[in-house]
């Protein structure tokens, strides 16, 4: 197996190496360079492309409600400030000359003693005052009639509202497959009859209510004087 691989490599080397060696029998032929003038292309006019304006309807953006952001309180460590040393300032003592104040003479004031005799106040007796209730007849107030007030009609000019263009929105039909619901069987529930024992209610005793008599003072009615009626004279 190894000998067959070696023979294959040897044949490949003998075939490739002679082709790669230089040919010294024929010298290379010199070919002068050929001048090629540059090709000038005329400028090509490209008219500007006009795009029709695209109408974009206004998009409603609902207001964004941002939840309140909790900011924990910032705790700052106490800053140590060393005490500032201030050297003592020397203040010389201020000398004030003594001020002479002559003594003020105040003569003594005589105040005789005030004697107030005791005042006797006999007790004042006030009998209880009974005021009869005052009767106030009802006051008749005729109804007040207000004339109708004429209010002319208010004319409002028509307000022009331009039509709002809404692009059609395609909504594909929603197909809901039928849902099979098997019938639910509920067995009958037996409820035994509930017997309530009789509740005894004792009789409630209500004492008789005694109302004190209401005092009604007599109402004074003045005598009504009727004027004399004069008839025609009678002839015998």
Curated annotation (Swiss-Prot):
Sequence repeats lie at residues 27-31, 32-36, 37-41, 42-46, 47-51, 52-56, 57-61, 62-66, 67-71, 72-76, 77-81, 82-86, 87-91, 92-96, 97-101, 102-106, 107-111, 112-116, 117-121, 122-126, 127-131, 132-136, 137-141, 142-146, 147-151, 152-156, 157-161, 162-166, 167-171, 172-176, 177-181, 182-186, 187-191, 192-196, 197-201, 202-206, 207-211, 212-216, 217-221, 222-226, 227-231, 232-236. It is found in: Secreted, Cell wall. GO terms for molecular function: structural constituent of cell wall. Coiled coil: none annotated. Its main location: secreted. It comes from the Eukaryota. Residues 27-236 are annotated as: 42 X 5 AA approximate tandem repeats of P-P-V-[EYV]-[KQG]. Keywords: Cell wall, Developmental protein, Repeat, Secreted, Signal. It comes from Medicago sativa. Residues 1-22 form the signal peptide. This is Repetitive proline-rich cell wall protein. This is a developmentally regulated putative cell wall protein. The lineage of its organism: Eukaryota, Viridiplantae, Streptophyta, Embryophyta, Tracheophyta.
